[in-house]
Amino acid sequence: MRVRGLCTLLSIVMLTAGATQAAAEPRHARNDEAIDYHEWSSGSFFAGRLDGLGFGYGGLRITHPAGSVAHTEPGLGTTRTYDYGTWTSPKYRQGFDATQLIASWNARTPAKTWLEVQARGRTSAGAETTWYTMGRWASGDADIHRTSVDGQSDANASVDVDTLATKAGVTLRSYQLRVTLYREQGSPTTPTLSSLGAMTSNVPDRFDVQTTKPGRARGIELKVPPFAQNIHKGQFPQYGGGGEAWCSPTSTEMVAEYWGRKPSAQQMDWIPADYQDRSIVYAARNTFDYAYDGTGNWPFNTAYAASLGLRGHITRLHDLNELEGYIARGIPVITSQSFLSSELDGAGYGTAGHLMVVVGFTQAGDVIANDPASSSDGRVRTVYKRDQFEKIWQRTKRHTESGAVAGGPGGVVYLITP
């Protein structure tokens, strides 16, 4: 289960068919794992079924609405009528029986618009699942409160924030995605969907992984701007409790600004002008998941990057050698990890869930990370031992301080590119 309050630190001191984005060189998976990312965009949208949507500048848009619906937004106290249209993907078979699915999307949602993404699968036993809601999303928060949907669980699967996980003994042989675009009735604006995809995986339970040998990215360090989340500790607590929990948007903003994209001064005019690193606060607000009550919803972060004009999706990587392929081509990678303070030398904290940016590798092959869990921007750059880092990122099971067994990220990454 994903931990609420992701990135809150326990301090002791303080591949793929259909995917065009940033595909790394082909690799063979370990014998015990399978990972796939598949994406529909541009011309590949023609393979799906349209109802009320059409092709326009930048992607799919509402053209002749399929219908209208009244939507009540409890957090805003509003009920509005929205026109809508849908796109449903063809069935996609990933080539193995999957136990997890994480959807990602890139879209523009101007005022008075939003979208909903759903997924369903066909199990290896031949049963078709229900449609599960993977997120209701808008780049802003004036029309809806972007949210994951709690309480989705049945005999086949359950949804934990952003991750569809099958029940014991159930696997997905194939899946479909569906997106519904909404615009307020009478509004001339429309949301625009530029891409929709999903990562599927079957990664076995493992407490440890074999350390890879240093590869092609030795001695490469990308100039990713460093931002520290702890500068914002206790600030703007309405967004997940404050900066101490903002590892995900801080990491996402670092990569966005590496690519030369950031919110405009006008977009940040609600933040005091003399506040340090204002873009981090903006990123926190615009990744905040109102049901999860935090900023660590993975696809909400890549969707935020896309709202700045970039492209992003969630996937898993097999190991550090695969990650090195991205660094060698100038692409920083955001990784998810969880660990005890004793498991990562130099961190000075333990965490049930944390995001940081891999920006390079030393000549010896150790990991150079921009770790946002720092007291100042000048202390963000950190070198971590290769074997320790690979373990805490790749494992799917771990022991907590009390000795209990908890989950691990299994190689999850955010990939964000121009």
Language model regions located:
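Beta-sandwich interaction modules
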Residues: A29-G54, T79-T99, A107-S194
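Secretory targeting and sorting signals
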Residues: M1-E25
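Conserved active-site-adjacent core of cysteine acyl-enzyme catalytic domains
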Residues: A273-P418
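Extracellular beta-rich ligand/substrate-recognition surface
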Residues: V69-Y84, H313-L317
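Histidine-centered active-site/metal-ligand motif
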Residues: T113, C247, H354
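Noncatalytic regulatory segments and standalone regulatory/sensor domains
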Residues: A34-G75, R93-F96, E128-W131, G169-P226, ...
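Active-site-adjacent structural segments surrounding the nucleophilic cysteine of cysteine proteases
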Residues: T180-G294
